[in-house]
């Protein structure tokens, strides 16, 4: 039985000095999970492709070739099964919910402090939540950054279900190094895994999310101090499942979810 990685198992690995190895194994499991694979398929549908029909047509063509004892030519796969309905529909759903921007009930909120493109980033988070099932927002000092499920592995508390930490990961090309950023309540740490030998090293030790620079009256630099937030600067944007829709619907994947986009802890 595979290990279920939670914030508690992360703390255990951290106490045992196995944090880098845990991060590698955790991300590997995330990339083999059902939600991650479905999110990859959703990206293909979003690009006006149809992976479900493509796989079926490939299997069908291979079956015909075997029945003909490899004498039959490959059956061409029709392009008519592809359309932009998936992207168009979800763009409309995201625009319907978030197209007018965010409005705060408290008139005292200074929205300008949230960044110039805050509304666009919220709409982006909502769109990825619609097609992937969930997305994640990271408050980076003075602006919002959106992470997709295909680039961010969340760590939830096994008792409360709350998001307590997470790992962002990326590799620019198959022949380049893998990069990780671990986000915790008390700061972030960067790691790099070499392509050759799979050696994982800490490239940036844990740093605070904010840097406070103190200067002298004359303008000289006196000190630079780190400061963190009172809570983890990450949030989950999820779409509540609608059980009345067929979960197994593959032709236009992810349409079984309702349009109720929610920001979740």
Where are these regions (language model features)?
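Intrinsically disordered, low-complexity, compositionally biased regions/tails
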Residues: 21, 38, 56, 103-105, ...
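Intrinsically disordered, low-complexity segments enriched in proline/serine/threonine
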Residues: 37, 53, 78-80, 156, ...
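Intrinsically disordered, low-complexity regions of eukaryotic proteins
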Residues: 43-45, 81, 186, 192-195, ...
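Extended, charged amphipathic alpha-helical segments
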Residues: 210-265
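Extended, Lys/Arg-enriched charged tracts that mediate electrostatic binding to polyanionic substrates
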Residues: 116-219
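Generic hydrophobic, helix-prone segments enriched in Leu/Val/Ile
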Residues: 43, 92-93, 125, 179-180, ...
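Extended, helix-rich architectural segments
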Residues: 1-144
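Residue-level detector of alpha-helical hydrophobic segments embedded in or interacting with membranes
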Residues: 30, 46, 71-73, 149, ...
